Each structure stands twice: as C-alpha cells, then as structure tokens.
C-alpha cells in the first residue's frame, strides 16, 4: 500500500559517524544523534521508516561483519525499546570502486518499494547527511532533508514534517490563489500559522530557492506551482508569481485583527540587507540595490526589484528594501531573506485588536 515513507540514512543521521575511519565497528563508537528518539516517536504515527545505508567493504577484512553487527544490533534494540521500528533495513556493502548498482544514490536497494508503489511520492522524503542522500531523493522523485546537527537537526526536521498550528484559538490563516493568463498558469497556497516543507516549482531554479527563503524565514508554509512561457524568458513567471503570492498573503491575513502589522530588520548577513514593512493597506515601494551581473543562474537580476514591487502592490503593503555588497547572488538572497524575516514580524498575532486608529486596514 502506498503510504508516506521516510528513507533514513544511518551513519551521520541516526547515529554519529566517526570522522577518523567512518566506521561504527564497536560499541564504544555507538552514539545516537541528539534528539533522534523523540523525533522518531513524533513521526512514527505519520510515516513508515526505511533505513538505507552504504557500509563500505562490509563483510571483508576491512570491515568484518561481526564488528558491524554488535553496535548495529545494539542501536536497533535501543530503538525497539522505545517503540521505534523500521519497515526494512537496506544496506549496500560495496565500496565505490566496486561500481555496484545498489550503492546510494542508485536505487536498486529500493526496488521493492518502487515496483510495488509502496511509498507516496508526494509525502515521502529521504533524510540523510550527505549529497548522495539528496541525489537519492532526486532519483526517487521525492524531496530530501539534508540532516545537519546545527543547520537542520532532528527537532527542525520534525517541525518541517509535522506542520503545526500556532494560533489554535483562531481559524487557520490559509489562502489559495489560482491565476491563469495567456502567459502563466499559477497556483499559490499559503498557511501563515504553519511551518513545514514548501513545495515550490516555477521552472526557474534560482527563483524557487528564493521563494523558499521567504517562507522559511517568514515562519510560514507555502506551495507555489507555476507553468509559464519560459521559452520567451522568465519575466512573466516571476511577475505573475509575485502578484499571486501577494494576493494570497493578503487573503490569508483576513481583516488583520491582532497582527503586529509593522516589521523591520536592520543589516543582516554580509550584504547588509535592510527591510521595513507596514501592512497598511496602502501600497508603496522603494528599492535600492545595484547588480553587476545580468543573471544569477537562470534568474535575471533586474527581476528582483520587479518581484518585490509586484508583491508590495497586491499585498497592499508599504515596503522599503535595500542591500549592498559585492556578490550579486548573496545580495539577491539577502533581500529575499530579510523580506521573509520582516514579514514574519508583521504577520505575528499579538492579540485581537485591529492595529489601526482608523478601524480598518
């Protein structure tokens, strides 16, 4: 039966991986990653767990089977004692030079799950600490969460996989906007009181990454799907996505009762990006940034200003943005990040009063 599934790496993700020899071949080396057990306990009612691991030279003189089995079985027993079970444990014992067809990121180990359609691609993930885990996810057609003990630990993974409503006493602040023209076909969904995995696909890779920065730093979740006339250029895709996203944010905010309304973030990152915002209902936009390059990846740098201008007018917000620095990629990214952080302040619910002496926003 197709169901949400987490394909989880072992070394460096579930348990610590020694940086000396990259082998857990004794009980002394066995150490669980921080908060992995509480995280898996929260996730187990929502996902099936499948362990997928490369173990270089397992069963050879360089890594005897019995040396692997002792800490591995001890790890499994710890998990079982806490009510955590794996549907399967799939291990490739080969070294890279063996050129096998089962070593991650190749997918032969998961043949049963693929052939029998046992996992739901829309709600399944690969969790691992290496680039090979990210590539495995791409080969499976699902998303990856690249574990990192500081940047994306198990607590954050749970937060992404189990969206939670932070304003339970209020109706969910959700909006869906569909915008179809001769140039683009767009669907935007926003959940202002949830965090989780953002599903974003516009056909412009750098732009997808920038949109994800808005939601991530804004503390909300969103899905953006856009099919545009990219055979011409990305202008309509970027502009129309901004218009749809601004409209969705405005609709999700409702009457704006209880929100903080104002937000500002002073210089952040190496690029010194600044943002001031007022969800005033009166659109105004001011932008100050200079770019040396015509494009960053597949994204025209001139579309940065146009994106924020478009979103300011459909969001009906006063927006001031500026950045300075040396690297155009970093400057653009800093603007999307600082916009997200400022928006996070503005949409935060503080009470039930309307933040306006006029009685309307």
From Swiss-Prot:
Residues 1-172 are annotated as: Histidinol-phosphatase. Keywords: Amino-acid biosynthesis, Cytoplasm, Histidine biosynthesis, Hydrolase, Lyase, Magnesium, Metal-binding, Multifunctional enzyme, Zinc. Its cofactor is Mg(2+); Zn(2+). Its main location: cytoplasm. GO terms for biological process: L-histidine biosynthetic process. Pfam families: Hydrolase_like (PF13242), IGPD (PF00475). It is found in: Cytoplasm. GO terms for cellular component: cytoplasm. It catalyses: D-erythro-1-(imidazol-4-yl)glycerol 3-phosphate = 3-(imidazol-4-yl)-2-oxopropyl phosphate + H2O; L-histidinol phosphate + H2O = L-histidinol + phosphate. Mg(2+) binds at residues 9, 11, 129. NCBIfam families: HAD-SF-IIIA, hisB_Nterm, Histidinol-ppas, PRK00951.2-1, PRK00951.2-4, PRK05446.1. In the N-terminal section; belongs to the histidinol-phosphatase family. This is Histidine biosynthesis bifunctional protein HisB. It comes from Actinobacillus pleuropneumoniae serotype 7 (strain AP76). The gene is hisB.
């Amino acid at each position: 039966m197709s169901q949400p599934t987490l394909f989880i790496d072992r070394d460096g993700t579930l348990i610590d991986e020694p940086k000396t020899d990259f082998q857990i071949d004794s009980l002394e080396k066995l150490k669980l990653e921080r908060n992995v057990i509480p995280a898996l306990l929260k996730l187990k009612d929502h996902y099936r767990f499948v362990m997928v691991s490369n173990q270089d030279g397992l069963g050879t003189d360089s890594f005897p089977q019995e040396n692997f089995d002792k800490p591995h079985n001890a790890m499994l027993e710890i998990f079982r004692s806490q009510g955590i079970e794996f549907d399967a444990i799939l291990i490739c014992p080969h070294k890279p030079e063996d050129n096998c067809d089962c070593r991650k990121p190749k997918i032969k180990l998961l043949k049963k799950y693929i052939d029998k359609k046992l996992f739901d691609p829309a709600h399944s993930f690969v969790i691992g600490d290496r680039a090979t885990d990210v590539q495995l996810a791409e080969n499976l057609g699902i998303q990856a969460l690249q574990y990192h003990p500081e940047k994306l630990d198990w607590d954050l993974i749970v937060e992404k996989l189990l969206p939670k409503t932070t304003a339970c006493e209020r109706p969910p602040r959700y909006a869906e906007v569909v915008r179809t023209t001769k140039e683009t076909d767009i669907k935007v969904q926003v959940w202002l009181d949830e965090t989780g995995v953002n599903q974003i696909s516009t056909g412009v890779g750098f732009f997808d990454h920038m949109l994800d920065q808005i939601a991530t730093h804004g503390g909300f979740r969103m899905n953006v799907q856009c099919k545009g006339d990219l055979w011409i250029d990305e202008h309509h895709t970027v502009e129309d996505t901004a218009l749809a996203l601004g409209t969705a944010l405005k609709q999700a905010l409702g009457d704006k009762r209880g929100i903080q309304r104002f937000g500002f973030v002073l210089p952040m990152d190496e690029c010194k990006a600044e943002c001031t915002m007022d969800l005033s209902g009166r659109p105004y936009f001011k932008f100050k940034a200079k770019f040396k390059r015509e494009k960053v990846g597949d994204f025209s740098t001139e579309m940065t200003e146009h994106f924020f201008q478009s979103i300011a007018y459909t969001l009906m917000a006063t927006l001031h943005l500026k950045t300075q620095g040396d690297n155009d990629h970093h400057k653009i990214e800093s603007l999307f990040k600082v916009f997200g952080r400022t928006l996070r302040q503005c949409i935060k619910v503080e009470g039930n009063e309307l933040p306006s002496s006029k009685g309307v926003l």
